[in-house]
Regions:
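Hydrophobic or amphipathic alpha-helical targeting/insertion segments
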Residues: 32, 81-142
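Conserved short beta-strand elements that form part of the metal-binding/catalytic scaffold
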Residues: 4, 36-81, 126-153, 157
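N-terminal beta-strand motif that seeds the catalytic metal site of vicinal oxygen chelate
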Residues: 1-26, 88-91, 148-182
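Core segments of cupin and vicinal oxygen chelate
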Residues: 10-13, 19-64, 107, 116-122, ...
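Short, glycine/acidic-rich beta->alpha junctions
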Residues: 10, 50, 83-86, 97, ...
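Short, structured motif recognition centered on aromatic/hydrophobic residues
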Residues: 15-22, 38, 58, 65-67, ...
Length: 183
């Protein structure tokens, strides 16, 4: 661990992406492209070797939205959508060291959801881990400095264009918590 990690107990470099679970990823992508000016830049699904879900990565400014649908009704993503409707499932944060950040969060009381794992392909190595946030929302810690491909292994680039409406970045996130459920 370097000195910067000691000085800041949870060094977050920024929001990497916000993932929405939706009933129809292709339709939702069309909506966010044409209604809000997000450009579809990457795709993952059966055509890229991912058999259980389909995802589109959308960008505008420094904002990345990951729009994901399940391909079977018994998938956890389908259960999320049945319970909540289309909604935010993951607010992923870019960090310098995903494993260290995960362990530190769990040490401080966070509930671990996904232990640190490595994803790799010919474009390098991506590291990630996840903790519970609130309700059924999670926070994924993403370490990207060793990865130089299109978003993540299993994604291929898209060449679509969209008319940006000028959104720059996500500057904060607000959670809606059910009455009586906030500590």
């Amino acid at each position: 661990m370097d000195a910067n990690l000691k000085a800041d107990p949870m060094p977050i470099e920024g929001i990497d992406y916000v993932e929405l679970y939706v009933g129809n990823a292709k339709q939702a992508t069309y909506f966010y492209k044409n209604g809000f000016g997000f450009t579809p830049v990457a795709y993952s699904g059966p055509e890229t070797g991912v058999r259980d879900k389909t995802s589109y990565l959308l960008q505008q400014g420094d904002i990345q939205l990951l729009i994901t649908s399940a391909l079977s009704p018994d998938h956890p993503i389908s259960r999320f959508v049945i319970t909540h409707g289309d909604g935010v499932a993951d607010i992923a944060m870019r960090v310098k060291d995903a494993e260290w950040t995960y362990k530190e969060a769990v040490k401080r009381g966070a509930k671990g959801i996904q232990t640190p794992k490595i994803l790799k392909d010919e474009n390098g190595v991506l590291r990630g881990a996840a903790i519970a946030a609130y309700g059924d929302t999670i926070h994924t810690f993403i370490e990207r400095h060793g990865y130089h491909g299109t978003f993540a292994p299993g994604f291929r680039p898209l060449s679509e264009k969209a008319d940006s409406i000028g959104l720059k970045r996500v500057d904060h996130v607000v959670a809606n918590v059910e009455e009586g459920k906030m500590d």
